[in-house]
Amino acid sequence: MSSTIDVNMSICDKKVSVTATMKEDGTFDIDIQSDCDSIKHYAETLKNITMDDITNFETSRINKEEVRGNMSMICMAPIAVYQAAWMECGMMSKRIYTKCGPITITDRKE
């Protein structure tokens, strides 16, 4: 079974969908779909990740500059990769995610 996280980047009017599928060897296939040209390199480069990639931020390929390519520093696609993989391996509850919805970032009106 796969786990999918959808992101609506309202600040740039782009959408990202990340699907993680855990394989028998414990690695994850990653499928990234987006209408953003800047994410194409990221999607083509990040097809497979390991458990270490989702648990060790310092060595994770998810955030490596050569993998991120032209993406903006504030792009939520890498966070969606973490969330989809965490959900797929049971580190984030699918039931709670379905019940409560996604993690959101909102503008604070003062």
Residue ranges of predicted features:
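Short, charged/polar N-terminal "headpieces" of proteins
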Residues: 1-28
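Active-site- and interface-proximal helix/loop "cap" or "latch" segments in soluble metabolic
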Residues: 22-83, 90-97
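Predominantly soluble domains enriched in secretory-pathway, periplasmic, or organellar proteins
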Residues: 100
